[in-house]
């Protein structure tokens, strides 16, 4: 499929806009939490289902690697985030002609990875605050960046399952001719 320079620029602009929107929303919500709540403070939104709970996550998404030595963990997690940033950016730039689902997925992953990396570099931890429990099972607190990364990965998976080829808009031929 051939893509014009203009179309490629539009794809890249949209990709950048989605990534920056995720980054802004992530950092804005984390800022609200850190300014209005104390660490480990909870505010119930939906009883027995959803709380806002301020957690300082020194591990990875959903608390993974929380027990790893802090000096090794910082290097490991920051390195992973930088590698993800480089791979996702390079792939997105090379595949701007691919599906919208792929581009949105990559943009969500990039925005989320950068959001959590900023926290880790600035604070040494990631601010988590979305706290869900379902049928008595508690899920580790997470944030907007984690959500964007998970949705982005799901979109990449869906993109691998099938193409979303959309025919180009154009004049519809008249019936019978």
Give the ranges of each region predicted by the language model.
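Alpha-helical transmembrane bundles and membrane-interface segments of multipass inner-membrane proteins
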Residues: 1-177
């Amino acid at each position: 499929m051939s893509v014009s320079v203009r179309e490629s620029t539009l794809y890249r602009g949209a990709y950048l806009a989605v990534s920056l929107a995720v980054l802004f929303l992530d950092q804005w919500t984390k800022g609200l939490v850190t300014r209005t709540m104390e660490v480990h403070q909870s505010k119930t939104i939906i009883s027995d289902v959803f709380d806002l709970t301020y957690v300082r996550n020194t591990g990875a998404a959903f608390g993974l690697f929380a027990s790893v030595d802090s000096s090794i963990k910082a290097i490991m997690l920051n390195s992973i985030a930088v590698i993800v940033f480089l791979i996702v950016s390079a792939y997105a730039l090379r595949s701007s002609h691919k599906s919208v689902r792929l581009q949105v997925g990559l943009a969500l992953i990039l925005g989320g990875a950068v959001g959590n990396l900023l926290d880790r570099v600035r604070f040494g931890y990631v601010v988590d605050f979305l706290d869900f429990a379902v049928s008595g099972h508690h899920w580790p607190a997470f944030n907007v960046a984690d959500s964007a990364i998970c949705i982005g990965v799901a979109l990449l998976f869906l993109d691998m399952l099938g193409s979303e080829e959309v025919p180009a808009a154009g004049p519809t031929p008249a019936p019978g001719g």
